[in-house]
Amino acid sequence: MQEALNQKIDAFVAANKEQILKDIATLVSINSVEGAPEEGAPYGAGPRAALDKTLELAAGMGLATRNCENHIGYAELAGADAEKYLATICHVDVVPEGNGWTEDPFKMEIRDGWMIGRGVADDKGPMVATLYALKFLKEEGVSLRYPIRALVGDNEETHMHDVDYYLANYPAPVFCFTPDAEFPVCNGEKGHFDGKLVSPVCNGVIKDFVGGVATNAVPDRASALVATDITKLRNAPNITLEPEGDGVRIRGWGKSGHAAMPEGTVNAIGLVVNYLLDNGLCNDAERAYLEAVKKLHDSTAGVGLGIDCADGPFGPLTIIGGKMSMVDGRMVQTMDSRYPTCTDGDTIAKQIRAAIGTGAELTDVGSAKPFYIEADTPAIKACIDTYNEVTGENATPSTRGGGTYARHFPYAVSFGPEHSDMVLPEFGGPMHGANEAAPIDKLLEALKIYIIALLRLEEIDF
């Protein structure tokens, strides 16, 4: 029976491959970065357009759809149970495109078996895969015990207010998985801490300081405008100098990446901070602030701020500075930390305040606790067993730093489709980075995994 099912799925995937890629390209073409709220578009026009188009694609597959008051939506297959249902959840909003792209970020390109475009990995590609999983079940006429909803989020990258709205107004699924992470199964996520380091009004040498496009992304470029003579400045690696007005624009060039996975990135804001300090381009108040910010950028493990720690399930804490801006004469540096169970938001805030002293003010603090679900529960076993059977691996559930929708649900995990050992091609970049890339074959394999996993979840007594 399993062999026959595998053959049916393989045939379905092969027959639908080209349309799957077209549908992903359609969603990628929509710039769905969060925007200003509008009537009927609480997260901006772009996310609303992506939500509408996704539901349109689902309806074209013969799936029932619902727009939940423009906050979120879903495609659904009916089942016998009138109260309990299973769900997947992906999101069609994206982080800002940022800089460094060699192609149009909103025009999907295919090169050597890879998709390139903003959202191909995070999370428009996986969104389309879940719709096709439901399409397969519908076309095969599978009689479902539990209805299955493919939830379509559009505020994941910023606040996740979409899923908060859904859970406040609709019953929660008995189990949910989100294809917004890595295989095999992620049954725990680090805590999340964020805040801002704000300077006093300095009225000094630094006239402007900007960098980054999102709090949860390592910036690949940043710049500061300083009142000085360019002939007095020296060259430095990854720094360029340009005359601008009566001063000099100092630009830092780094390497972008996701805040939860900062290994291998180079923070451009940190490069500029170091250059300003090394060359004395600051008055006393500015120096005190830059010294505080330098402690943030000295280590993505939080060593400079005295918040570094690690535990068994989650590993080490990470922290990055995502955006720098000037607001009403004050420099404002955002930060994003993912922390394990050996600390908490209050402790992190206290330690940061002790580290920065009077040089900066820590404001706008927010945190969410880590979550963890035991790996031996039936639903998680169904997911991990399916993954291992399809791939031939012997993987076990793991935890991660990135925060997903899973932490909002009573019983949920993240489930692919990325692979931690995936090697990006030279022309490809990571999630949240330039030239975001995803391998076509792995996404199609994930589709097969999702179909089989959903069938197995249908057999569980929830």
Region roles according to the model:
Residues 83-152, 158, 170-171, 428-442:
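Active-site metal-coordination/substrate-binding segment of hydrolases
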Residues 12, 385-460:
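Zn-dependent metallopeptidase/amidohydrolase metal-coordination segment
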Residues 92-94, 148-159, 179-184, 213, ...:
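Acidic, glycine-rich active-site loops and adjacent beta-strand->loop/helix elements
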Residues 326, 331-402:
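Substrate-recognition/cap regions that form aromatic- and gly/pro-loop-enriched pockets
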Residues 2-118, 142-144:
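Acidic/His- and Gly-rich active-site-bordering loop/insert found
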Residues 125-136, 270-274, 445-452:
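Short amphipathic alpha-helical face segments that pack within enzyme cores
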Residues 157, 164-341:
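Midchain, well-structured core segments that form catalytic/ion-binding scaffolds
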Residues 95-110, 192-193, 198-199, 242-252, ...:
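Acidic-glycine-rich active-site phosphate/pyrophosphate-binding loop
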